[in-house]
Structures are given as C-alpha cells and as structure tokens.
C-alpha cells in the first residue's frame, strides 16, 4: 500500500516538473537580417551601440560601488557585526546558549 502511494506521488511530481520545465525552456525566436536567430531574453543587448548599452546598464543599478572596490578596505570594521547592517547596534550572531555539561563549561558549585 505504501509503495503504491509513493509511486503515485513520484509520477505526480515528475509530471509537475516536466510541465514547468516545458514552460521555461520555450524561447520565442526572432531573426535579424540574415544574421541568425536569437532569443528575446536579453540577447539583443550586445547588438546595440555602446552608448545605448552603457545607459541601459547604468539604469539597472546593479553594480559594485567604488567604495567596495577600494584596496585594503574592510566594509565593516566593527567586530562581530554583519557587513550588511554595520551601523545597527545589534550583534550579527549573538551567543545565546547557556553553560552546560555538553558544552564543557567550567562550573563552580561551591
């Protein structure tokens, strides 16, 4: 009985994966003056002139800042802080566990 249920779930999963893969791998193609066909998913960017391409890349704001590229620069010099929230007052990964026999902490019982 359990094997039949696993087989049905496996086939159902396979059908869902096949359907979603079929939807993502279909590309609409366009041909440009006998230069061959290319997909419409951003592959035309290299065919544009450099000024237009540069402006589109600058408008996307997906670049590394000059401050991050400086030599010998640590993004956050505060010890124990995350690089992403360096200015906040909280520690990035605070230690919250207590002392126990498992962690081999020294206890003074007297």
Swiss-Prot record:
<dbReference type="GO" id="GO:0007267">
    <property type="term" value="P:cell-cell signaling"/>
</dbReference>
<comment type="function">
    <text>Cell signaling peptide that may regulate plant stress, growth, and development. Mediates a rapid alkalinization of extracellular space by mediating a transient increase in the cytoplasmic Ca(2+) concentration leading to a calcium-dependent signaling events through a cell surface receptor and a concomitant activation of some intracellular mitogen-activated protein kinases.</text>
</comment>
<comment type="similarity">
    <text>Belongs to the plant rapid alkalinization factor (RALF) family.</text>
</comment>
<feature type="propeptide" description="Removed in mature form">
    <location>
        <begin position="24"/>
        <end position="58"/>
    </location>
</feature>
<dbReference type="GO" id="GO:0019722">
    <property type="term" value="P:calcium-mediated signaling"/>
</dbReference>
<feature type="signal peptide">
    <location>
        <begin position="1"/>
        <end position="23"/>
    </location>
</feature>
<keyword id="KW-0732">Signal</keyword>
<dbReference type="GO" id="GO:0005179">
    <property type="term" value="F:hormone activity"/>
</dbReference>
<feature type="disulfide bond">
    <location>
        <begin position="99"/>
        <end position="105"/>
    </location>
</feature>
<feature type="site" description="Required for proteolytic cleavage">
    <location>
        <begin position="54"/>
        <end position="55"/>
    </location>
</feature>
<dbReference type="GO" id="GO:0090406">
    <property type="term" value="C:pollen tube"/>
</dbReference>
<protein>
    <recommendedName>
        <fullName>Protein RALF-like 19</fullName>
    </recommendedName>
</protein>
<keyword id="KW-0372">Hormone</keyword>
<dbReference type="InterPro" id="IPR008801">
    <property type="entry name" value="RALF"/>
</dbReference>
<feature type="disulfide bond">
    <location>
        <begin position="76"/>
        <end position="86"/>
    </location>
</feature>
<keyword id="KW-1015">Disulfide bond</keyword>
<keyword id="KW-0964">Secreted</keyword>
<dbReference type="GO" id="GO:0048046">
    <property type="term" value="C:apoplast"/>
</dbReference>
<dbReference type="GO" id="GO:0080092">
    <property type="term" value="P:regulation of pollen tube growth"/>
</dbReference>
<dbReference type="Pfam" id="PF05498">
    <property type="entry name" value="RALF"/>
</dbReference>
């Amino acid at each position: 009985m359990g094997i039949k249920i696993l087989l049905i779930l496996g086939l159902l999963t396979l059908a869902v994966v096949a359907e979603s893969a079929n939807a993502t791998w279909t590309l609409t193609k366009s041909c440009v003056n006998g230069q061959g066909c290319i997909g419409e998913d951003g592959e035309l960017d290299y065919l544009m002139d450099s000024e237009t391409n540069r402006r589109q890349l600058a408008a996307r704001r997906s670049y590394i800042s000059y401050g991050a590229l400086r030599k010998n620069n640590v993004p956050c010099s505060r010890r124990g802080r995350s690089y992403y929230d360096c200015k906040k007052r909280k520690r990035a990964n605070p230690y919250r566990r207590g002392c126990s026999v498992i962690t081999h902490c020294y206890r003074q019982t007297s």
